[in-house]
Amino acid sequence: MRMNIYNNGIYQQDIESAWKLGNFNKLEGSRILITGATGMIASVIIDILMYYNSIINISSQGIHILAVSRNEEKARERFAPYRDSDFFTYFSHDISQPLPELGDIDYILHAASNTHPRAYATDPIGTITTNVSGTYELLSYAAEHYCRRFLCFSSVEIYGENRKDVDKFGESYLGYIDCNTVRAGYPESKRLSESLCNAFAAQKEQDFVIGRFSRVYGPTMGKDDSKAIAQFIRKAAAGEDIVLKSEGNQLYSYTYVVDAA
């Protein structure tokens, strides 16, 4: 699915539409570090920014992207069209470890995380350390290098289970999470990553924003994505029956990936 994404007319139209909605001139000359670069949302953000770079005047300063992920082979394939661009730099790094010296970074987008149930189950330690240690290391770098803004990719999972006292969650809602389960590592560590942002703002005056993304879907979903919506789409595309593991009465918010980006 990802191999042919640059040849998909619908996806390219979506990228162009997203560019038209943004005011990217304000980012001219900026250096933007994006972690989890090959992930569902981050890869779309990179495509949008690189689309902007492809149509700007030759004298423009452009937007410089530093893309970070763990799987270099996957990244080389995903971002092959940008390999020779002066505006794109990729490096492989475990963000739970301190960053190498990269110079000043204007914006950091922390999108690296295990984001589907199978990953939580098979790599619970990595899930927690990426969300907690990774956020700490990135915030530390941001604070030391006068980063203008830090964007933390969080999740609606921080709201926990509905206590049956509301029909819809507000931003201040906190439901139940059983912390003595492996599955709790994801929402609990996302909660802590948000707390770290607030701590750095209070102690280091680091500017930040948090995006609590709902259930995101779209063409950049990985083939190994085990979330329900990903399974539903794969089944439907293959002409197979969709299998529900519940009565299907729950109400969820879904966001198309380009809208999320």
Tell what function each PLM region has.
Residues 136-184:
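Conserved Rossmann-fold NAD(P)-dependent oxidoreductase catalytic core, especially the SDR/UDP-sugar
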Residues 35, 68, 108-114, 150-156, ...:
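SDR active-site strand-loop-helix element
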Residues 31-51, 55:
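N-terminal Rossmann NAD(P)H-binding glycine-rich loop of SDR-like oxidoreductase domains
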Residues 1-33, 47:
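Non-catalytic terminal and boundary segments that flank Rossmann-like NAD(P)-dependent oxidoreductase
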Residues 81-97:
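Rossmann-fold cofactor-recognition segment
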Residues 107, 123-137, 180, 184, ...:
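Glycine-rich NAD(P)-binding loop of the Rossmann-fold in SDR/ketoreductase-type enzymes
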Residues 162-172, 185, 195-261:
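NAD(P)-dependent short-chain dehydrogenase/reductase
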Residues 92-130:
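NAD(P)H-binding glycine-rich loop region in Rossmannoid oxidoreductase-like domains
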